[in-house]
């Protein structure tokens, strides 16, 4: 039987692969597939709080894999829709969903108080890569591979 569960890292992996194949071959079909995956994942995974803050109800590290795919697609198309949405949620979490040690909560909406809850590696260890990618997207740092 087929498992009906949907995970952001699966889509992110396929999205990254589609962009990589487009970059290597120049075949439009791969870019079209990447755009299809990006828009489909955007519609399926993103939810919004009452205040309009975007979030994805999955593990933050799993969401990072999707963000990698969005970042790769952004580098090709220049369309910031997907990366901007994730950055908005990330920045909100940075301000509203961290404990006294600065570690991010599992729930990036800040709707649950996780200050005293032990943190899980998959929730906290992804944050530096998120912000490294944000810095690349904003042009604050360069990716040495792309020089």
Regions found by a protein language model. Name each.
Residues 17-20, 69:
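"A position-specific structural signal for the A-helix of alpha-solenoid helical repeats
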Residues 21-28:
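Inter-helical turn/loop segments and adjacent helix faces that build the functional surface
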Residues 1-17, 60-64:
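Structured, solvent-exposed acidic/aromatic patches
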Residues 6, 31-147:
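CBM-like carbohydrate-recognition segments
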